């Protein structure tokens, strides 16, 4: 089985800076920071080889990728005592694209993945700050729409009036 997912943080580290070609710059640097015991939130990197495999396999992801991502996500959930999609203690993650070489400003990021109409209420309760929770959700929708769905980010600015639907 090919290893597609490399974990870092929370006492586990599958990589280091020497794996830049495999993990991309961000992934290799996160692995290296975890390796030298710097405080790095737990996470994982999907290797650059997944992109190659995807295109070599008629735009299908490797069959064993999902199981590896699920296992890595479960490890994070256990480490931070939150669960992806949980209404009371939602786990929020960031998805950051990366490459073997640095390309400042060219790679996309989606923050607060895990927020939805239900989990935003759990975030508001857990944080004690409803405005923060709704603003985080708004920013997630804007980033996801722009990065993943290719919706012009200016369209979101026209709709935005307040981070809380009650304001």
Regions found by a protein language model. Name each.
Residues 24-30, 109-143:
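Extended active-site and interfacial segments that coordinate phosphate-rich ligands
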Residues 60-102:
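Glycine-rich, N-terminal phosphate-binding loop and its surrounding beta-alpha-beta segment
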């Amino acid at each position: 089985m090919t290893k597609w997912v490399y974990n870092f943080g929370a006492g586990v580290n599958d990589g280091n800076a020497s794996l830049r070609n495999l993990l991309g710059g961000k992934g290799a640097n996160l692995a290296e920071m975890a390796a030298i015991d710097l405080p790095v939130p737990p996470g994982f990197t999907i290797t650059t080889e997944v992109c190659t495999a995807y295109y070599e396999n008629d735009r299908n992801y490797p069959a064993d990728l999902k199981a590896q991502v699920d296992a890595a996500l479960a490890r994070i959930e256990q480490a931070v005592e939150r669960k992806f999609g949980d209404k009371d203690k939602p786990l929020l993650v960031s998805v950051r694209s990366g490459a073997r070489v640095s390309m400042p400003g060219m790679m996309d990021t989606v923050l607060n993945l895990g927020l939805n109409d239900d989990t935003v209420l759990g975030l508001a309760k857990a944080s004690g700050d409803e405005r923060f929770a709704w603003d985080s959700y708004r920013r997630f929708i804007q980033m996801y729409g722009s990065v993943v769905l290719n919706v012009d980010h200016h369209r979101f600015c026209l709709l935005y009036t307040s981070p809380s639907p009650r304001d």
